[in-house]
Amino acid sequence: MVIAVLTYFLKPEYFDFIVKPSARQVYERELKKTPQDLEQWKSLKQLALKDSITTSESYSEFVQTRIESPFAAGYWVNVAQGESVFATIAIDTIKPSWILEAYDIQGKLIQTARVTDSSLALQIINDKHQRLQIVLQSFLEKRDSTQLKIYKQPLLDFPLPGKSNNAIKSFWGVARDGGRRSHEGNDIFADRGHPVVAAADGRISAVRDRGLGGKQIWLQDALTSSSHYYAHLDSQLVTTGQRVSRGDTIGLVGNTGNARTTASHLHFGIYKSGGAVDPKPYIWQIPIPENSTEMPFKSRGVGFGLSAFMHQQPSASSVSLRTIYEDTLQIIGNSNDWYHVRTADSLAGFAHKSVVRLIEINSSTH
């Protein structure tokens, strides 16, 4: 027993198959040999956790590291119930030297990325409203560039194959019956007879023809612990108790029930234990971002021009954080035409390339 304890403290890596340390813990174990490096590494993580930038639903960035500026940055993501979050970076699988993690709003680590082929990838599926922070940090000795992507995806398939977001013409919460009730679903329009598919694997819990929904199907989905409601169908092609797979055709679009005076469409709803929830995030199709273009890069820049403002997102319409006129900036990376920058007082954001002048690390800023 004593030998085992001593071995753990002297050679903890021998017990990794039991303890299963995170990539960060393994790297910090190596850095204990050089305390000043360990202190720098930990301070960079804290710097990233203080970042306040918020990504869009489909975000990409070209990131680089330099000798004088190891990479560390934090990216907030607002996640709706029904969405999952993906974060990936391209890596050299021979010796990965990046840390990619997800933290909750209290700063608790909830997931560390795993190596997948030539990438480091996170996939977070919690099926609830939340705000997450993705942290990307390079090893101190890393001198490289990579493509970072952070994007959201719906948990379910779109219930009408061949159709997309623009086929949804009526959304959650719209007033019905003169305001006496609200719309508890999405109306997705298509020609009569268009296939309706199972949005997830599950079991058909009911097949009915009655009331406002007319011909309807209920599907019990274990993935999201919910019931899917398909209404106004022209035909039902499944039976109660039947098991179906994601993408199986279960019915055909129609206008039965109280939709008999409207154009044919599918009313798609989702019900959880507390009642109906907005189905839009569960099916809303979000494009996977393309790689961000690489812009000219130096470790430092200076803001210039009266329109030199830092924004929360890489968009002129996003929240303006502050002016950066004549401020010296650390250049972290770029999201297409926007530099990801950090000010001397550690505020991170985005500045358009037109208001950033790149400078040599030892040159004057004026």
Language-model features, listed with the residues they occupy:
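SH3/SH3-like beta-barrel superfamily modules
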Residues: H129-V135, L321-K353
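Acidic, Ser/Thr/Pro-rich low-complexity intrinsically disordered segments
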Residues: A4-F9, Q25-V26, R66-S119
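Short aromatic-glycine-enriched beta-strand elements
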Residues: L212-W218, S264-L266, N336-H340
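Zn2+-dependent peptidoglycan hydrolase active-site motif and core
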Residues: A199-L237
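Non-catalytic extracellular/lumenal accessory regions of secreted precursors
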Residues: M1-A73, Y151-D177, G305
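Surface-exposed, glycine-biased beta-strand/turn segments
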Residues: D127-K215, R246, N255, L266, ...
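A short macromolecule-binding patch
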Residues: S225-H232, S346-R357
